[in-house]
Amino acid sequence: YGSSFPLNRTQTTDSLGFETMDYNVVYAQMGRGKTERIVASAIASIAATLAKLAFDACLYNSQNFAFIKLPDAFTTGSSIMPHKKNPDVFELTRAKCNKLQALPYQITLIANNLPSGYFRDLQIIKELFLPSFDELEECLDMVDLMISQIAVNEHILDDKRYDYMFSVEEVNRRVQTGTPFRDAY
């Protein structure tokens, strides 16, 4: 481990902007893949939030809920049901974010059970890890754009199917006006 050339390790450490020098080269070698896995876990956490938001947007945009309406630019029609609006952009964002959530596991599986040192296996981590930053940024940008253009159905509670949603509030109101709880309920 290390180098067979007489390097000034202090100067190299300073030139590269590291705070301290790793005196134990074995420790430095044993860290391969660990930092990437930690960062990948942060990426996966953000992606999980975006995927859940995308799922909710798809659900709440559906005709069964209709809580929100997505702009036409973010949807496509169905060949068999032209009136249907498929939330393509949110569906693709959800899939991309779900893919990003697999990144820590991919890194773990590649780096797992390798002996100390550098092996070509670790090259595959870079192929997965480095593009993930751009992929996450694209998802963040797309969600930011979509959220700003979602229309909320402000009159959804006028629908009779939601009458029971506020039944507890109605019971409490009746109790406060003197109706016994059992009668109010």
Residue ranges and their predicted role:
Residues 1-110:
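Internal glycine-rich alpha/beta core junctions
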